[in-house]
Amino acid sequence: PDELSVLPNVSEVVTDKRELPDMLSRFGVVDIPTGISEFGNRHRAYVKVQDGCLLRCSYCIIPHVRPDLTSRPQEQIFDEIRRLVDNGYREIVLTGIHLGHYGVDWNWDKPKEKWVRLATLVRQIAEIPGDFRIRLSSIEATEVTRELVAVMAEYPQKICPHLHICLQSGSDEILRRMKRRWSTRTFINRCNLVRENLDYPSFTTDVIVGFPGETEEYFQQTIETVKEAGFSKIHIFPFSARRGTPAADFPEQLSKKEKQARGRELAGVEQQLRKQYFDQLVGKQLRVLVESPLSSEKSVVSSAPS
C-alpha cells in the first residue's frame, strides 16, 4: 500500500473493502448504485446474492479466507434483477459462495417462522413481473429442501428445473475425510425428491477424483453413486492440494497418473449419463432460450431450462 500511494495520480489506497463507503464519502459519493445492469452481448446474467461459507471442508480454502456469511438485502437483489430484465436478459442465475445459506446470517436471533431462506428469496423473485427465467447455481444436498422444491414446482415457467448439487465423492468414507456433512444416501434421496415433483429435472455436479485415501473400491462407489443420481453433466477435478487446508497434509496421496486414469474413467461414465438424460427429451416440447443463430443453417443455438 505504501508503494502504491506514492504513484502519480493515486489519491487513496483501499486495503479493506469495508472502508470503501467511508472513503468514497470523502470524495462526495454518498449513494453507491449496487448491482450490474449489463453482461455484454449475452442473454444470461449472474446475480450474486450471498457470500461466505462456514462448512470448512478439508480440501477447501474458502472458509479460511471468507468465513463470514453475508446475505445481500432482498430489495437490492430485486432492483438489480428488474434492471437486467429491462435490459433484455432472459435468464437470471443466482450465485453465492454458499447459495443455500442465503438468509442464515439474519436468522440467528429470529423465531423459526420468521426465518428468511433461499426458498423465500426464489419465490419473491419468481413473482417479479417479466419474461425471464431463474436458475440456481451450486447448492448443497441438504439445502434441497421440500420448501425449495415446492417453490420450483409452483413456478415451472419461471424457475429452471435444474440443480447443480455438489457431490465431490460418492463414497461415504471419502465424504467423511472431506468433512462433508451428509451421506450418499441423503444425496440420492434429495435427487429423488426433486424428480418426484418436477418434470424432467436435470442434475449436474462436481466430483473430486484421487482424494487422499481414495482406494479403487471407494472410487467404484463414486461411479455407482453418480449412476444412481443420473447426472446430465459432471465437472471432474483431480485432487489438488491447497496449501493451508487439512487435506494437503493427509497421508495416502495418490499419484498424478492414478488421478488422471480415474478422471478419464469417470468422464466415460458421464458421457453415457448425459446421453441417457437427453435421449428422454427427444420428442418433448420445451421453451428454450435462443442464444444465437447458426449462419450456415436455418437453426439456432438455444439452451433448455434444464
Language-model segment annotations:
Residues 214, 229-231:
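Contiguous mid-protein beta-loop-alpha structural module that forms a pocket-lining wall or clamp
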Residues 5-9, 30, 110-112, 152-154, ...:
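Short, hinge-like loop/turn segments at secondary-structure boundaries
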Residues 249-306:
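Terminal RNA-binding accessory module
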Residues 86-217:
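Conserved SAM/AdoMet-binding glycine-rich loop
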Residues 1-105, 117, 163, 185-196, ...:
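Proteins enriched for Cys/Gly/acidic motifs involved in redox and nucleic-acid/cofactor modification
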Residues 165, 206, 226, 234, ...:
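Hydrophobic, well-ordered secondary-structure elements that form the walls
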Residues 130, 148, 231, 246-249, ...:
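Conserved N-terminal phosphate-binding loop of PLP-dependent enzymes in the Aspartate aminotransferase
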Residues 217-224:
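Short, acidic/polar
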